[in-house]
Amino acid sequence: MSHVVVKNDPELDQQLANLDLNSEKQSGGASTASKGRYIPPHLRNREASKGFHDKDSSGWSCSKDKDAYSSFGSRDSRGKSGYFSERGSGSRGRFDDRGRSDYDGIGNRDRPGFGRFERSGHSRWCDKSDEDDWSKPLPPSERLEQELFSGGNTGINFEKYDDIPVEATGSNCPPHIENFSDIDMGEIIMGNIELTRYTRPTPVQKHAIPIIKGKRDLMACAQTGSGKTAAFLLPILSQIYTDGPGEALKAVKENGRYGRRKQYPISLVLAPTRELAVQIYEEARKFSYRSRVRPCVVYGGADIGQQIRDLERGCHLLVATPGRLVDMMERGKIGLDFCKYLVLDEADRMLDMGFEPQIRRIVEQDTMPPKGVRHTMMFSATFPKEIQMLARDFLDEYIFLAVGRVGSTSENITQKVVWVEDLDKRSFLLDLLGATGRDSLTLVFVETKKGADSLEDFLYHEGYACTSIHGDRSQRDREEALHQFRSGKSPILVATAVAARGLDISNVRHVINFDLPSDIEEYVHRIGRTGRVGNLGLATSFFNEKNMNITKDLLDLLVEAKQEVPSWLENMAYEHHYKGGSRGRSKRFSGGFGARDYRQSSGSSSSGFGASRGSSSRSGGSGYGNSRGFGGGGYGGFYNSDGYGGNYNSQGVDWWGN
């Protein structure tokens, strides 16, 4: 092998210098384009290679003059991913709650739960929203508008609300409004009110909105279906839009610097059930459309991991059940340090379900601002004495608002009570369903979970499209059942009491108490699922010997609501009263305390607002045993009854008087 000495050749030296990765200055500054870059063999000695390693030309450049990448997947100077949008993920993989598209600046589709938030984990908080005007609406989204506002009905009987009496007690009560335009709630709220097709406020909204806008605490007692949810959401969101995020935004930013993802909601709404929490959340989505406010909902029975991921995208208004909220707080995911607005919806129901320890833990034993600093509202259809005493601890110089017949039922609901033995209930139910038509939404209440499954199976084999919900069903199954019912695919829903409170299912035409509850207040909430927000409705209850304990209360309720009272029920109530059966009467009818502000009672036994009427003047008759008068004692002869059953006859008028 021969060794040949090669003379120094300038071109060869240049190539060797280019192969030296550790020498950025080999070319003596004459060829700054190379900067020690390796040149692929197919580009060596070509003129086209001169611009290939230009530091300004492409992503191959690794110049230290830039502290962030500029290509797909790059990082900007603030350490945030260029691929991940700084605005956070959207709602349900379509558009987010404020109308932004799923596509970020580089055309990448947003995938829920796929990290489309910055490293600190709270996208909507950590943008430049502190510099933005929260009162200005964001751009509209036609697709999101269709999703949020496509349904709804204000009701054909809305005018009747003008005559409902209202009683407000408390110092310096703000004057009520007659129209939404009478009070300044901002451009965003007024636009969303128009989209929801609300023409004018209901009585509870007329009084509650100016009270909350005036930053006064409130305890409101209104009939079910009267628009309580909008009564507190509208003024709370209006105030948030006006005031902005305040200190909560800084707290989230500061917290995020250390890798934590704790959220500090500005408003908290507590609800007793998962269904009611989801319903309030959906309403909050409507009224926060085109705003920078992001509502969230957390409840038990669902994947907590998914709920945490949703929270980490930002949370300004939180709707929660008490148990799941305590869990989130103990995990360090929720802080209430900057909560300005607290709402307890269906407060009596939460106490009935045993949530008082959790509520006090949330309100009194954590970091929530004390009363007088935060603004607190309590809403429910009934307010017994225990709830009003709880208000002393949570509310500061509050206003008590009683709308209509407190704890009573709406006159928009036609109530029918029929005597049906247990063995005849299924046959009578089939007759009712046949009379009301297969397209009408019908809600059937039973007392037990087993009874719900059994009745659903019976109706299915009779050819009826039906579904059911109760406490043993998974959250997913319950939500699917409610969706099938709302959409009309399964127009018959069999339910236990889990669905009785707070559910806002539009256009329920008929509520049937297949099994009457033992508590008259539960009866009030059950039949309140129909006749909502001015719509007309019908409630039919099957009564027999097992329901003797609510005879007197049921009679008083029918009289209050100006309903037709069967003569046999009057006779039963009279006899039951004089046998001492009134000992089991509910708190609602024990002097009517839940109907008025306890601060005004001063120990008096006054019956108060909407108190029950006595029945001492009822006819003694011949005793209820011989006065059922339904032909054969069962449902068979009931069609010819003068007082009630005539509307069942297919040859006469229907249930609705047509």
UniProtKB/Swiss-Prot annotation:
GO terms for cellular component: cytoplasm; nucleus. It catalyses: ATP + H2O = ADP + phosphate + H(+). Belongs to the DEAD box helicase family. DDX3/DED1 subfamily. A motif (DEAD box) lies at residues 345-348. This is ATP-dependent RNA helicase DDX3Y. Pfam families: DEAD, Helicase_C. A motif (Q motif) lies at residues 178-206. Probable ATP-dependent RNA helicase. May play a role in spermatogenesis. Residues 1-10, 44-68, 93-128 have a biased composition (Basic and acidic residues). Residues 209-401 form the Helicase ATP-binding domain. Residues 1-141, 597-625 are annotated as: Disordered. Keywords: Acetylation, ATP-binding, Cytoplasm, DNA-binding, Helicase, Hydrolase, Isopeptide bond, Methylation, Nucleotide-binding, Nucleus, Phosphoprotein, RNA-binding, Ubl conjugation. The modification N6-acetyllysine is found at residue 55. Residues 15-34 have a biased composition (Polar residues). The modification Omega-N-methylarginine is found at residues 100, 109, 588, 613, 628. The modification Phosphotyrosine is found at residue 103. GO terms for molecular function: ATP binding; ATP hydrolysis activity; DNA binding; RNA binding; RNA helicase activity. Residues 601-619 have a biased composition (Low complexity).
